[in-house]
């Protein structure tokens, strides 16, 4: 147990720059390139392509700044990160014969990059929770919101990023169809906020290590199996059925629309019977 605690403590002291941050920029820009029409936008408007990629890379910081009424352009003050992300963007889109992109598209390398990106997700959630706590002491809902925004901002502002590329898909709103990264980031924000308030009986570095291992394991599994379904789907379906499903009226109990207006009127069968009796009387 002591060795695990020491390992998790050393893990929590890792520096994200430059290797993990570079992996984050690589995976983010490659994801941006793989969107429909992104390559065409890069050939027609490099500025729009660059801005779109920067939203993928720094969307979390931009969104959290907006929510806390801070200047969203403050992200530009980190010149080193902007230059590094811009260099990655240029290499991914404009390197001759796409050699740079194809090199990092190789599955084993991409698995490593994806795992490193999940490490940065944990750090971003933590920084968001701590940043919100510095503004609003022990405001758990604010801490969860900012941690969520900092860790999954690129997904949460995806509609705005699409507008930059000239695409408008309101049905792809993350609040309507929440993707797995956004869901798991929200769970992480809740866990780290509860731990920060000492509502969870676990140290921060142990929670960081366990949560990051979970992220990496699920991400690698989804990439190897090429699955896009959320691993939380069975639980979500059960909870939705129990808590949020409307009670359905059995079909045999429902009345037809015309039945309410026919109350008090004799049925067609009765009318036919009565008319038949009248005809018999006439014949007699």
From Swiss-Prot:
Cystine residue pairs: none
Q: What Pfam families does the database record attribute to this sequence?
A: TRIC
Q: Please give the GO cellular component terms listed in this UniProt entry.
A: endoplasmic reticulum; endoplasmic reticulum membrane
Could you tell me which residue ranges are on the Lumenal side of the membrane?
A: 1-15, 69-79, 122-139, 197-204
This protein's source sits in the domain of life called Eukaryota
Activity control mechanisms: Channel activity is activated by increased cytosolic Ca(2+) levels and blocked by luminal high Ca(2+) levels.
Similarity field: Belongs to the TMEM38 family.
Q: Could you tell me what this protein is called?
A: Trimeric intracellular cation channel type B
